[in-house]
Structures are given as C-alpha cells and as structure tokens.
Amino acid sequence: MARSRANRAAESACGHWTTVPCFMCTNQCGLNVYVEDGKVTEIKGMKSHPRSKGGTCVKGRHIVDYMYHEKRLKYPMKKANGGWQRITWDEALDTIATKWQRAKEQYGPASCSVFLGEPACLTIETGWFMAWRLCDLFGTPSRFEPLDLCGTAMWMATLGTFGYLTEPDMENSGCIILWATNPHASDPIGGVLAIEAARKKGAKLIVIDPRRTPFARKADVHIKPNLGTDGYLALAMINVIISEQLYDKEFISKHTVGFDQLAQHARNFTLEEAERICGVPVADIRQAARLYATSHSGCIRHYFRPGFMPDGVHNYRSFAILAALTGNIDRPGGELTFGFAQFAPSTPVRLREKLGDAKWVGQDKFPLFSKYLSFFKDGSMTNFSDSILCEPQQVRNMILCGTNPAVSSNNTAKVKEALSKLDFLVSLDVVMTESNKLADIVLPSTVAFERLNFSTYHGEFIGRQLVEPYHEAKSEFTFWSELGRRMGYGEYFPWQTDVEAMDYFFAPHTVENLLKEHPDGYLNWNVLPGARRYEQNGFPTPSGKLELYSETFRQYGYDPLPTYRGPTVSRTKTPQVFEEYPLQLISGFMEVEYWHSMYHQVDVLRKRAPGMFAEIHPATAAQYGIRDGQPMVIETSTGSVETCARVTRDITPGMVAIPAGWEGNNLVTNDATMDPISGVPECTGLLCRVRPAAGHGKQDVVAVTGDQVMEMAGE
C-alpha cells in the first residue's frame, strides 16, 4: 500500500522498518517489512539480499492480505453436534494429552502419530525441534512429513553419489539445464534473476519439459520427452559424453570410482532407442549432451518431478553423474556444495535413546531411506494411509501440523478414508482446510512474522517476531512444548519462550547476539563458493570419492549404477491399458501464486489464478470434443476429476497437465506404485483419458479461457 510523505515523516514515532526473510515459499527472499501500531502494513524487497536482490513475487507482495485475512483461524475449536464449538487452549491441550496417553496404554506409543507440514511456511525448524523431541519422549516412531512429495529421491541420490547435497550455480554457469522445472513458478525471483544474468553473459540454455514454459521459449534446445522417460534420456546423454570422450578425464581419474563399470553400462542406452522410448530426435539428444559437456561450466536445475517415477532415485543419480563426468562439482558455474548448518545445535534436539528399537513406518521396506535421511525424518509418507487402514490398525491418533494431505497427497480418496478412520485427529493450521474438516480438534497457528523462526534451507536465518499472534493463535513451539509438559515431560521442556529454547540449543550463541551481529537475520549462506574442497578432503562417501558405482546401493540390494525401468504403464509396456487410457498426465505443476495448497483464500491471488484447470493441446482437444474454457473430465485407473479446459499450444499433443494444490487434483493419482528405493509415489507419466463434462459441471469449476487467464496475469 502507498504511504504519504507525512506518514513517512512520522515513521520514527509510530512505526519502523525491519529486515526479515520471506516465508511464503522455501526460496526465502529478503524483505523489508514495515510495522505500525502492532501490525505489518507494508512489504518491500531487500535490495542487499544476494539472491532476490530487492525483488518480490506476487505471494510476497501480498503477505499482509494473507496475515490478516478474515478466513484465518482465530481460536481452538472442537467438533460437536455436526458443527464446530469454540473451546479454550487448556481444554484442547488437556484433551489431546489424555487421548494420547490412553492410546499409548491400550495400543502402544506407535499408535499415536504426527504429520508435520511445510517447513518454510508453517512449521519452521523451531517447531520441528519440539515435535521431534516430544515424539522421542513419547516413544512413537510414527511421524510423517511431505518431503516424499518433494526431495526424498533427490536427497538420497545426491547423498549416495557425492556424500553431500548440491545447489546449481546458475548465475555463473556456461550452460544451464532446466530439467522438468519452471523457475517462473517455483523460483520466480532468485532463480529467474540468476538465469537471466547468466544468459546476458552468453550462457546456453537447455530446457527439458513437455510444457512450453517461459524459459523454454528462449532456450537454445527445448526437449519434450514422453513422461516418465527422463532416466533413459539422461543415460543416453551419458552415453554420448563417454563415447565421444567429452568427459573430464583428470577429474574422473582422480576423484571418482566406478567409471569403467559406468562406461560399459552406458553403452546399453543408445540414441536410437532413446528416440523410440523418449520421443526425442537423436540429433536433439546429441546436441544437448555436447552443449552441456563442452561449455566452460554447466549445471542442472531440477526439482521434484523426476522423483515421481519408479526410477526416481536412479534419475537423480544420472543427473549427478552428468555433473561428475563434466567435472562440474564444487566449482563456479557448476554444482556447489550445499553445506549443512554452521549454527547447528550444540545440544541435541533429538532424544533418540528414548525410542529404543522402535521402527518408523516403512523402515523394513525402504532401508536405504533410513540410512540417508534418518537425520531429517522418520517415516515414509507413502505408507501413512496404509498404517491407518491396515489390519490390525497401526496408527489411531494423529496430529497434523501445517499440512493438508486430503488435498496434497496421492490418491486423496484413500487419504480421506484413512483420516476419517482415526480415533482422534487434531490439526494445527492457519485456515480451515479439507484435512481440518475431518479433525476432532482444530487449533489456530501463527504465521512467521508472529513468532521466532530459524531455518537452514536457503542459508541459515533467524526470522524475528515482528507482531503479536493473530487472535488466539499459538506457535508450533508453544503447542508442542505445552503438550509435552501436560504429558509429564516438563523437565525436557523447561523453556517458557522460543527464544529461551534457541539460546539453550545453540549455546554459546544467543538470539540477541546473533541478531546484533546479523541485523538482517541472515547468519550464513549454505551454498558455498566453488572451491574444489574434494582436492584436500575427498568426498564424504564410504570410498572417499565421488561414487559413480555405489557399493552401498549394491549392499542394500539396489542397482549400483543408475538404470531405467520406465513408467509402470505406457504405450509400449502395457498396450492394453494404453488403449483404454491413451493420454499422458502431468499432475501437479506449480503456479507462482500459490505454494502447494496454500494461499487460495487470498483474493488478489485467487483473481489471478482462480481455480483448477487442465492444459490440453488444440489437436488433442479437438480429438475428444473439448473446448477452451468448458468443463472436462479427466479419468485414470484410480479415479476422476472434473475441471476446466485450457486449450493451449504450450503443452505437447497427447498430454494433459493439471496444477498442484487444488482439491480434486489428486483423485486421479495413485499411491500403489512407487520408487522402490525412496518410496516416492509414481505420479508422473500416469495414463488418462478425457471427455467433455455433462452440462456445466460442478459449481466450483471455474470456466475461464486461456486468453482471459493471460489478461489476468498483470496486477
């Protein structure tokens, strides 16, 4: 909102500016926030921020609308007489503690579960600390969070290859591959600025995506593979780089293991077969491989979509090996070390010894998951519905904390059935969601500016509390701490404020001193400049080298080299299924206005992106009698959903694409097939069919044409 000159002159008397990180997504851009009369009233970009450089996306610009929206939850409520009844926090906490203790006595501690949500936007790590701690004390390993729909496969692959995580240095790169990602939606400030800066310096751009995204229009090479074939495409590129001897021979010789096995293996993935499987011309594959390998540096930006396949971990292993072959590791313009926390807790947050031999859900099925990710999480989300619906029932009580699985999880019909079967369901959230509607108790949560935050995602930062909580909202820290004390664990939760807890865990650092030393809240940038540290210290892997061939994978019964199996169903593998479902489905691409299922209540954002839709090519639409802006039905073997058709040439013929986060979009995805290494469900490359909807469809179908949507894009 604009401020008059008179108001600005009076700032020192009635308000002040503060520098904090944004919390509307995991990119965590820098913000200058104006606070007046106890409320946040204005948002500006922080020009000194190294990634966002003063920019803000549409979500960040409308934080005020989000914070003070009338649909925010104001006080605790319990379900009663078919509706909601206001209760006190004391009643809510006492009820939860009693229910959990009784379930523990009758069914054991594993019958009680927590499902932690989006770490960037609701349960920032301060809250996670307390949730982990309470679960350890209570003795339950039944805990879930949505990393399985984001980075599990990627993390397992990079940790298994490099020993650490990496981040592409796009701004300094000579060649950037955008693999199944659209930065204009997922990283619209820092990512877009970095790519544009590199392009101005002459960087080449390769986009691998069936959709024609903004950067695909500008790319030197745009590859549009069949869905689910990314792994074969990457292995074919590896074949080109090795067979044409375009790899960094010195790096491979000194710093890797398994090159000979990889070279032999890669010969199996020919360009001719890649053209047949991937639907990509041989010349395009060869051009992309040569361009990437011969540039002075190269990096690959990918997000979660390549993990949504039966070959998810292998796909990311192939991407990592492309970087390794070209020597683009820990050097400017390549894949930089994504360092872990410099300000790590000096006192352990976890109390694992209290768990004993308890196994988390899915531990036997996904043993390598436990090896690489047990520091971060303790359960496979893919199994969470099964842990409720199985006989005998394993999980009976659950606390949702900033998560909406009834919309965001695969096969939501099954998810809703599972949540409804629970003996007792609690949800801590900002607004009423589809998941909250199934709960017995709903609790109002703070948002980031209403509490202290600490995070290590894009750099370590402290986000100071700027204003008091909205109505009766409480922070995750307060909720878990007070619940722990009611359960009899008071000695483990002695802190009355989150600042006291942070001072304890991070001693000798204190929040006060850290903010004095770093007034903008940014303590350390995790992405370390390319310094080739492996030359002195090697790689943090069992061999001490970058592992092209993974002995660890072999010992766990998995292929030690990345391989390709392809989608569970496809035109070539299951022709009978393809005859019934002849189209490929892209499920869950991102929209810049939202973060998963969040912020749909914000009016300005809803005006720009009013509801769920399906992209379909004009040729495909004509084939099935579908018209732009009219209701259509998408069907898979799992279920069906009615939505609005957006006829566009920005998608490959024979494919249909729907965005993430809208109610109903996961009625057509399944949780029955998954990556056997990570447990990530298969939701890329599913087969579907389409038809026009009868009549005008449901009332919540938003009928807008592609041209109308483009007109709405400006504010």
Task: List PLM regions with ranges.
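Active-site phosphate/pyrophosphate-binding segments
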Residues: 237, 257-381
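Catalytic, metal-anchored helix/loop core of enzyme active sites in primary metabolism
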Residues: 440
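N-terminal export/assembly segments and adjacent metallocofactor-ligating motifs
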Residues: 1-244, 273, 281, 401, ...
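Flexible, glycine/charged-enriched surface loops at secondary-structure junctions
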Residues: 107-111, 247-252, 299, 330-337, ...
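Short beta-alpha connecting loops at secondary-structure transitions
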Residues: 219-225, 458-471
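N-terminal leader/propeptide and maturation segments of large enzyme subunits in energy/redox metabolism
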Residues: 77-89, 246-282, 364, 467-543, ...
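Long, contiguous, secondary-structure-rich segments that constitute the structural scaffold
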Residues: 476-520, 601-615, 619-715
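Extended redox/cofactor-interaction regions of prokaryotic respiratory oxidoreductases
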Residues: 126-208, 215, 231-235, 324-437, ...
